[in-house]
Amino acid sequence: MESIKILRQNPEWLESAVCWFHQKWKVPVEAYRESMRICVENVKAIPQWYIVADSQQRLVAGAGVIENDFHDRPDLSPNVCALFVEEKFRKKGIARYILNFIRKDLGSMGIETLYLVTDHTDFYEKCGWRFLTMVHDKEGFAERMYCASTYQ
């Protein structure tokens, strides 16, 4: 398995990461660029971005940690967001590896709990996340909020 690149330690990957996440999630390029720029320039824990590249240096997986993933509970923060693994790299443990890496990295920064919204409930429960509550997105639709302790 390829190793995880922490964007704050690998700023040369910023533009590639911006384009890759935009392609996967259709969030505006500028929103990703701003968040990743803050990640690279800032010494604070949030936001953070993580990427995985294959042997040809193509991005194949990644995730971020932001204050709020477009829901109505700003008190449930920070949020893991945008976890994605390219189809041909799935079922190899990469997503679980990224999630555990994030839990360790954020734990080392003093963050105790992480949150995320998802409809992939079985996967996250198998990864040690637990259902916390329902939240609502910007359009008012209910979403399941999960939480997990970091590794400190």
Regions flagged by a language model, labelled:
Residues 1-17:
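A short beta-loop-alpha structural element at the N-terminal edge
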Residues 26-51:
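Active-site rim helix/loop that mediates acceptor-substrate recognition in acyltransferases
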Residues 47, 140-146:
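Short hydrophobic/aromatic beta-strand or adjacent loop that forms the aromatic wall/cage
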Residues 51, 58-68, 79, 84:
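Conserved beta-strand in the GNAT
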Residues 51-52, 115:
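Residue-level detector of beta-strand face positions
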Residues 69-77, 81-82, 92-94:
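Helix-adjacent hinge/juxtasegments
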Residues 82-85, 91-104:
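Conserved acetyl-CoA-binding loop-helix of GNAT-fold acetyltransferases
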Residues 108, 112, 118-142:
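Conserved active-site alpha-helix within GNAT-family acetyltransferase domains
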